[in-house]
Amino acid sequence: SCEIHLSGETGEVNSEMLKMFRRFPLKRLIFHRKNTFRDMQSVIASQREVEKQAGIRPEAGMEFEAFVLNEMCQFTGAFCNSLHCDEMGYLCRVSYWLGTVRNGDAVPEKIMALQEQAWDQEPDLKAYDESGYLCGETGCGLCALYQLKQAGITHLKLVGRGNYVDHMEKDIRNLRKALEILDAAENEREFKCTLKRIVFPAGCSERCYYQ
């Protein structure tokens, strides 16, 4: 039979929302990018308690998925006002700067300062490989894997829509490598240090899902 996975593009994810959807029932809940570790842990703990009281075996319980690589969305998915298709650029990727407006015109010195600040935030060119690939260039949650595991996340979402096939292959390999490092690490500090040394030896994009 078919299983229902609730998309990570829903407007809100919390215990009350999950309670409303239990009547369907759901096999998997996908958290969106703005959920904190505490949010996720609270929702998962609430569901696990319901399953325990209902006598549901742990392996048959609801699955929980979180975003881990690519396409960090400043509009939080459900509130996107852009059009996503391969033929047009995404609104969220159009360069812009926020600045003070004076008499209907942007203040020039403020614009210049913000522009320089934006350039400073770009990843170091040395972090890219010879094909122009940088793991997590448009959004990354690999450093958060330890905390996602602690929160009770069972599955990870690697976004691949519109991406190059060879870059997707590298993403999958890097995610596998990160999970191997996670399994071998004794604590979060060891995990992050090893991850940065092996997966990001020249630095990362610093476009973190989970701050």
Where in the sequence are the language-model features?
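Active-site pocket-lining/capping segments in soluble small-molecule metabolic enzymes
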Residues: 1-16, 20, 30-211
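As written
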Residues: 25-26
